[in-house]
Regions:
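Conserved Nudix-box catalytic region and its N-terminal flanking loop in Nudix hydrolases
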Residues: 41-83
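Acidic pyrophosphate-coordinating catalytic loop
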Residues: 25-31, 53, 98-110
C-alpha cells in the first residue's frame, strides 16, 4: 500500500501526492526543498535578522530550513520551528500557502502558522541576531528578496510562483 500524505487535504496537489512520489519528483529535478514559516500575530509577521550565515547576512528572513531525507514536509516544518524558535506546532496548524520554484534549484514551501505552543526564543543566536514582529504592510527594505516576492504572491492569493526565471 502506498503511504499517502494526508496532512494537508485542502492544499495544492503536490502535498497530496504519495510521499514516495514527492521524493522522486524532487530527486529527479535535483531540487533543494526549503521550508519557510510565516508566523502571524494579528497583522505582524515574525522575521529573523540574519548573521554569520554567509547568505543575506544583515537582512530579515522568515524562519526557514531544509527538508531532510526521509522527512515529510510537515515534519520538516515542525522540526525547524522547534530548532529555530523553540516552539511546537501541531500539523493541523500548518497551512501551505505558497510554493515557489526558484531558478537557483530550490523549491520553497511557505507555511502560514497562527497557532503554536511554547514561548518563542531565538534558539540559533549564532545565525540570528534578533527575532522581530514586523507589520505585514510595513516591511523594511532589507528583507531577503525572494521572501519579499513570495509574501507579495501570498497577498495576491497566488499559491504558486517562480523567482529568478525572468
Amino acid at each position: 500500500m502506498t503511504e499517502m500524505n494526508s496532512e494537508f487535504p485542502s492544499t495544492p496537489t503536490f502535498a497530496r501526492l504519495p510521499i514516495r512520489l514527492q521524493r522522486d519528483a524532487m530527486a529527479r529535478k535535483g531540487l533543494v526543498v526549503d521550508l519557510h514559516l510565516i508566523l502571524r500575530q494579528g497583522v505582524r509577521i515574525l522575521f529573523g535578522l540574519r548573521r554569520n550565515t554567509g547568505f543575506s547576512d544583515g537582512m530579515y528572513h522568515l524562519p526557514v530550513g531544509h527538508l531532510e531525507d526521509e522527512e515529510t514536509i510537515s515534519a520538516g516544518a515542525i522540526r525547524e520551528a522547534k530548532e529555530e524558535l523553540g516552539i511546537d506546532i501541531h500539523p493541523a496548524d500548518l497551512q501551505l500557502v505558497h510554493v515557489m520554484h526558484q531558478r537557483s534549484g530550490r523549491l520553497s514551501l511557505f507555511f502560514e502558522v497562527r497557532k503554536w505552543s511554547g514561548d518563542l526564543v531565538n534558539a540559533e543566536p549564532d545565525k540570528c541576531e534578533s527575532l522581530d514582529w514586523i507589520p505585514a504592510d510595513r516591511l523594511p527594505d532589507n528583507i531577503v528578496p525572494y521572501a519579499a516576492v513570495a509574501l507579495q504572491f501570498i497577498r495576491d492569493s497566488e499559491n504558486v510562483g517562480t523567482y529568478g526565471w525572468d
